[in-house]
């Protein structure tokens, strides 16, 4: 009897072991064909619809909240840079980098200081420039002159949005 229990255990284990343990567990016929690009950590992954790894890039930085695969196969990735500790907000980033297909950093740029900080997203443009979404420090006086209700100011400052267009130059500069 022990022998039959053993045989049953071996066969049932082998059947369970055949279930998928890695990748996509549900595939819907209405799923768009293509790839998924995501950066959950210092690494960025490109996977197919079955969850198979197509490519991977490594970074020295924690991720910001956006990543783009560019037409030439390079990767535009936002980075979380919090070394200034001036402003802490949801979606804080502070930097961006472009990596080639082999993972070499070909351009890296920080857009953060005590008066401005990149956050959430960037947008690569067809001309090679990048739109950058950022917060910009306004003093209470500046904010009130621009129409802010003084009763709604916290810490006597305001961090409104601004968007700039930058042109990557060299390996770590921008116009």
Annotate the PLM regions.
Residues 1-20:
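Bacterial Sec-dependent N-terminal signal peptides
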